[in-house]
């Protein structure tokens, strides 16, 4: 009887314990313990620690610093500790925690280490995405076949002939190696072997699931990888049987959990109090007039800072919406061969959109200058890589490279000014291209090119529904975001997570083009959206490193020139103030904010060009008025939502099943990268080595690093800038409506029941009382903002306090 189905099922089961890892050029922040989310958080981190070796809670030093800085409310901490059965002073308990977590390093298995060394060498060669000049032979046949072909020439394999003589089928190899092991051991064996190199196996898992161009051309699977690994282990005589040792409970875990809950409750309490108070004020206020402009930003925490400063400069209204602007598309820029997903990883692209030239003269200028630059780059690359010319080229050009290196190191700002000046001679794509959004009745791969009119109307209506829009200003700007860094392998981690680690400008341009379509506007008016004739939609992109907002104004008529001029001036002022705030957060002088952020963007020796989403801890779903007068310190995701325009709860359902899941991914990536950077992060950028355009090593080889670098999280050694807290979501809506959504989506309720994030609802229909989710769709009353109405607040199910 064939065991092939059992092997496949066992591998699929084991693979859930390894998080997917996206290539570094399109880095996606995701929960490294996503496969454990069906378990309570406390149990998940314990099992992950046993399998992967990572810590699940912040260190004693981190808790102590938070307590000293006032980030943990002493009364809340006392209550949490008492409930957990701890009666001693927090400082004494922290000392006890420190003693309990001191443990000896685990022993290393020499045979397994040797197998890891061999495999990582060939994995890096096989999975290379364009950086190697000489490719691994026979990659088209798949990893297992290619590995068999090169193994006999690898002197690091003790008996290479054994590998070369393996069966052609990877399943047969696995069957042979596991023949002496009962089937009930297969899943644990696969789990241990996948967890041995979680970076590489996470990349294989993601690549196989994605089925992109590289995977189609050079296929690899976990089956082929495990066949090669098991064969190597068998060849070196390594033991395969899983350990029977039971998991020793971490004696400090329960105590650390109490400290973590108190820290989270301290932050959440302040956030909920703010939202509840503003909810009361919002109910008592009259609607204002038509704003001078409306700007829609990504829900990204970095947007909170620039939005706050824009609103302070004039009569502007800002909104938060997922940064892909609701368009699940694959995007191909002008004159590029590669398409990228421009939507969250939890969605599959539904359309192919490309840039098409509309201005022949500007296109000609772009092509001419780009051609000169590309030709020069190609000549230099050829001279460097050719064995016959490399030495002479280095001898001739070395002094010039040395001067350039010194200039970029000592005066990066001036060098960047020169690059910018040269770059201005080459028009940007958006200056002569428009996104091809009209349906073309053709396909690129499996995706239709463009969008039908009905699809355009649906995407625009969905955006306005989710944000609760009822009025439109003369200018409406959809503003994507991107970062600007130099010599940074992790640059995509600073771009838009909702666009799968790519810039959000293209999505903003697509939605603006859709909304300017007269046929679309007519259909929107039929659906109740009163769009004035003088409303113009446009796109822009927020540079999160420098806080510059670039406006793409090709769609703006002369009648709106004064509006646009005023907006540009106010955006410049907002940039100065936001850049000052960011510079100060990085320990620099706030008075030189713009120049300092520009330097960080240009300096190739700068390991911290910006903080990214460090500090993220909250997600507020509700009208902007709830937070517009509050400094949230760039720590909260903000999604616009108006419960009064969403009677059936469909908009709320879309937000909870989409953006809330993505923000939880981001939050857990930052959490685990902070609490154990060696296992779940990627260590220091200073010692990173990029490999294959897919990831980085720490040092000169080994496993791919899976998370965020230290410089994105830590102000200094053992001093986190990011406060490692699980996400606190606050929703402004009737609590019964939220309960209905959770009841319809068990996966959301599971995340909450298992404490991967928290949820609080401020109910405007119940005198703005706040309700905190407990479990099993039950709620407890948190606070009472108004004493005017003595009626007891109610929810579908309210747990006893």
UniProtKB/Swiss-Prot annotation:
Record organism: Haloarcula marismortui (strain ATCC 43049 / DSM 3752 / JCM 8966 / VKM B-1809) (Halobacterium marismortui)
Keyword annotations from UniProtKB, A to Z: Cell membrane, Membrane, Metal-binding, Plasmid, Transport, Zinc
Membrane topology, as annotated: Peripheral membrane protein
Chain's role: Part of an energy-coupled inorganic carbon pump.
Organism taxonomic ancestry: Archaea, Methanobacteriati, Methanobacteriota, Stenosarchaea group, Halobacteria
Family in the record: Belongs to the inorganic carbon transporter (TC 9.A.2) DabA family.
Subunit structure: Forms a complex with DabB.
Region (Disordered): 575-596
Segment forming the signal sequence: none
Annotated GO CC locations: plasma membrane
Residues holding Zn(2+): 298, 300, 481, 496
Essential cofactor(s): Zn(2+)
An example Gene Ontology molecular-function term: zinc ion binding
Subcellular location: Cell membrane
Name of the protein described by the UniProt record: Probable inorganic carbon transporter subunit DabA
